[in-house]
């Protein structure tokens, strides 16, 4: 195949790759040359008269600005219907007859469509709108989109404050209900203490307010004696338990619960020790 620059007219000898001979140009004398350089070298006949058609400029001569911003002389359909437009629109159309740039046309079109009153200034870019970036022609969009939101906080501040006041009271009542329910659950779930510990069930019963039962930790002396007894016997009998309760000033139930918790703790320690020694073969 030949390159684009090496193409020659059909009038000269042309070599066809599929053939073994040259084709002379006399066989194609009725055809015009290949890719004519001028429009006049390739005349064409039309079934209609071309004199009635308007003269169209070349594509290279028409720029984007001339195409986008067209004067009123190019659009004949608008001039034929003057009765469909109001007088005010006609005045603005005259103002838009020769705009300078595409941005001026767009800004002025917006001013015609949305701000056609007499108080609107001709210099759109000189006056900046509410948003600080776009011209005043775009203020209507911000008024419709954000106007209601901006006006809402300043309408009824007192009503909003009064409407927000009741929820804390309800939350406080809910928290009180929650504390009452937890206290009831604790009372039902925990077994009743012995007769010697009934007086410290509620410390604030005289005030009429229910308070949580205070934890009474064991003293160092009590813990030392209990640990000593646990060292000799993990399971304590009833006689020894009563003896410890009288000696340490504790209830029988407190001593029993301490031994139960201590056995669970010892079991956990033994499990941890076994796991530690089995995972380390060097020990």
Swiss-Prot record:
Q: Please indicate which superkingdom the organism of origin belongs to.
A: Eukaryota
Q: Write down the PROSITE patterns for this protein, in alphabetical order.
A: HOMEOBOX_1, HOMEOBOX_2
CDD domains tied to this protein: homeodomain
Among SUPFAM superfamilies, the record links this protein to: Homeodomain-like
The record's Gene Ontology cellular component field reads: nucleoplasm; nucleus
| Coiled-coil stretches | none
Q: Which UniProt keywords apply?
A: Developmental protein, DNA-binding, Homeobox, Nucleus, Transcription, Transcription regulation
Query: Region Disordered: what ranges?
Result: 150-215
User: Where is there biased composition of kind Basic and acidic residues?
Assistant: 177-187
Residue spans of biased composition, Polar residues class: 188-209
Q: Carries keyword DNA-binding? A: yes
State the Pfam families in the record.
DUF3528, Homeodomain
Function of this protein? Answer: Sequence-specific transcription factor which is part of a developmental regulatory system that provides cells with specific positional identities on the anterior-posterior axis.
Annotated protein name in UniProt: Homeobox protein Hox-A11b
